[in-house]
Amino acid sequence: MTTIVEEEPLFYIVMLSIGSFFALGSIIIAVILILQHFIHYNKPNHQKYIVRIIMIAPIYAIHSLLSLFFKRQFWALFFDISRDCYEAYVLYCFFKLLICFLGGEEALKELLSKKDTQPLTWPLGYFFSFTPKKSFYRLSLGLVLQYAIIKPTLAIVAAILYYNNKYLEGDFSISQGYLWITVINNISVLIALYFLVMFYEVFQNELSPHSPILKFLVIKSVVFFLFWQTVVITVLIWFDALPKSDVYSSEHIGYFINDFLVCIEMFITSIAMGICFSYSDYVIDKSTHDEILGNGKRSSSRGIGSRSGRNIKISSKIKNIKNNFNRYRHNIGDGLSDVNNPKDIILDTIMVAKLNKNNNNTNNNEINNGIIDNNNSNNIENNGKSRNNIENNIDSQDYFNFIDLNTNDKEKQSKSKYFKIKMPDSDQSSLINLDQCESPSILYGSLNGASNNNNNNNNNNNNINNNNNNNSNNSNNNSNSQFESIDINSNSVNSNKNQSDAILFTF
């Protein structure tokens, strides 16, 4: 310590001393709060996320203190990587905590099914509105999770660029990676925070008993405010607006100021964490709560004011603390195990990736189905024109070959210039001119197996009438309609297709 005092400027010694005091205070407050949550570990699904969130204050404090001590030299880069990874992780944990407050994923999806249309979060709410559905949860989770992935990834990229002389903090030139990484980080965190706010607004009434506003402000101040504080100081360094000293440049002084401020801010953050993430919400037995605090209320009636009474009170406190530690050591072990288990974020990442893949496949299928439907509509329209353009001078032998839906004789399905299509038990028929068709294939079929079962002809006619009245819903309501595509060149059945009428032609 003597060496530091003799060789370092006074302002640096003051910053390091005061920063150490506040960093140590932040660590003590956070550790006490975490232990209290572990002792009353009655809702693991809630408290494991709460403990992870509380840990950001001591982690930031330790990072800033070490960065200040090492003067942001070699080790500071690794501190930044670890801090950035955990910062993004905390935002994800807060989102999962909100889901737990709502009763879990299944309860959340049930709530979404009952939501009405509402405007988007400011400023887009002036122009757009939306109706939250089940997909809103998946979208919000994915966009919060993207920050938890992009932030540490860019931190690792920054380390690689740094060792290749392509990354220099405070250098906003296009050739350096600092500018691009800062821009991408800013966009990523804005998207994550925007959808986090939107998620809160959708479930504002359901989350109000848990006082989420203060919790969100604490998280936002750590994630968003500190990011912009670093950017502002970096800009001041870039414009050489900070003072210099005989030992350190304005760049080093800017980094010292930033690390010093973070140490103080994390002390305030730890106090705020103790208020908005209190363990008292998870205390079941109030008498146990008194014993854990060691206030000696159960033995306070013994000779208060006397020396022996004070000794009994002190020994009672020690005994209570010891007994409670033995009693709740399993809770502490379970809490440490849950907090350090990254299974949830891994499973959520895999789930979002699979859902996005399935959505892409679904969208492609919908597009393909839309194309097929359009082609079918065009084919039906062209077929209608073909039926209306039958020539008057048709040769009599061209009428010979026709498809009769009342027969199973495939030999009659030979190639001909014209085909006569006869409805089951109906005198109506239609003619098709194959010369006007690009591909000589025709759809024939029956409703409820009418061509194979003559006993159901009356029902078939009723179904045909119903199908004609419900063409817009034929894909869902006519599951009994079976049509087979016949290639007239090969006289073979190609596929089965549901349609809404007994006469449909595609070529």
Swiss-Prot record:
Q: What is the annotated localization of this protein? A: Cell membrane
Q: How does it sit in the membrane?
A: Multi-pass membrane protein
State which residue ranges cross the membrane.
13-33, 50-70, 88-108, 141-161, 179-199, 222-242, 260-280
Q: Which InterPro entries does the record match to this protein?
A: Ostalpha/TMEM184C (IPR005178)
Span of the signal peptide: none
Residue positions the entry lists as glycosylated: N360, N375, N470, N473, N477, N498
Q: Region Disordered: start and end of each range?
A: 448-500
* Segments of skewed composition (Low complexity): 451-500
GO CC, sorted alphabetically, is: membrane; plasma membrane
Q: Please tell me where this protein is predominantly located.
A: membrane
Q: Which UniProt keywords apply?
A: Cell membrane, Glycoprotein, Membrane, Transmembrane, Transmembrane helix, Transport
Q: Which GO terms describe its molecular function?
A: transmembrane transporter activity
Give the family per the record: Belongs to the TMEM184 family.
Name of the featured protein: Transmembrane protein 184 homolog DDB_G0276041
**What's the gene?**
tmem184B
